[in-house]
Amino acid sequence: MLVLFFGTGLKAQLPSPSYPPRLVNDYTGTLSASQISTLERKLVAYNGSTSTQILVLLVDDLQGYSVEQYATEIGHSWGVGQKGKNNGAVILVKPKKGSERGQVNISPGYGMEEYVTDATAKRIIEKEMIPSFKENDYYTGINNAVNVIMDLCSGKFSQDEYADGDGFPLWLIILFIIAIMVVFSKFSGGGQNYSGGGTRTIWIPMGGGFGGGGFGGGGHSGGFGGFGGGGFGGGGASGSW
């Protein structure tokens, strides 16, 4: 009974969704108002076009939970994502304060785990987030992670491609292949001269490397309508610095 009561007390200390509900909830004062607004617009627009909900939460105190438990409990109790689809994700950040280490967790809902596996979540944390957090730039780290998660879910690149993303960007590889094809076609043209016949223009997508695009959301109007009842199973990854 004592253990049950204590566990219930812990859960009672978790924050409730704000009203009106928001996808960016900074209880630490770390992000500026403009940074919160920019992230919120992006996440609301993405939710509006895909129904996928990515919650960003910053807290100073984990209330006795591990960072993994805290993120999973928030995702489940707030109902991040849509019921039946379970297409939600929680990005939880406990900023570094004084001698206390900073902690971060990415927890995908059941329906997101095929796009953001535990290994991919760990890579996002180590590659996109912690380097910026160490420079006290929380906005860039969070924004980079959001962009990568959106791009993975939209199929802009696969998890394997993201894992190999430390090499050449995909668009540069495509450009290189096209250049080789153009040169090869000219030298195998059966003695045709290179003058006349017009000039073809080849359009190359200049999307840049992973995580740079994301979802703009500038054309979306209206606010966030609320969470949809998604479920979480405890997957994801954590990191600290």
Q: Predicted regions span which residues?
A:
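Bacterial N-terminal signal peptides
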Residues: 1-9
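Folded, non-transmembrane soluble domains that reside on the lumenal/extracytoplasmic side of membranes
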Residues: 13-166
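Low-complexity, glycine/proline/serine-enriched intrinsically disordered segments
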Residues: 12-13, 113-114, 118-122, 126, ...
